[in-house]
Amino acid sequence: MTVEFAEKAKKEFLKLDTPIQKQIQNFIVKLQGMKNPRSTGKALVRNLAGRWRYRVGDYRLVCEIEDEKILVTVLHIAHRREVYK
């Protein structure tokens, strides 16, 4: 499985503190080793329907999953109180 970051997510990632970046990097490595990326995520609803979120500490990764390409694209990374705004 491949995990990619959208430009916005890359910028958000680089703004995070180093320990949080390492937490997210460790999660991405685990995610790449999974057969089913939906097993640890949660489907989003309403205006974010069709996207998935992953919880990494107090941060959330909003992603799109493309089954035919076996690709997870990270669209947005933010603190849990800000991620859905």
What is the predicted role of each segment?
Residues 13, 17-20, 52:
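Flexible interhelical turns and helix-capping residues at alpha-helix boundaries
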Residues 20-23, 34:
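N-terminal non-globular leader segments, chiefly Sec-dependent signal peptides
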Residues 22, 39, 54, 81-82:
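Positively charged, low-complexity intrinsically disordered regions
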Residues 27-30, 80:
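Conserved short hydrophobic interaction patches
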Residues 29-53:
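A short, surface-exposed loop/turn module that caps and links secondary-structure elements
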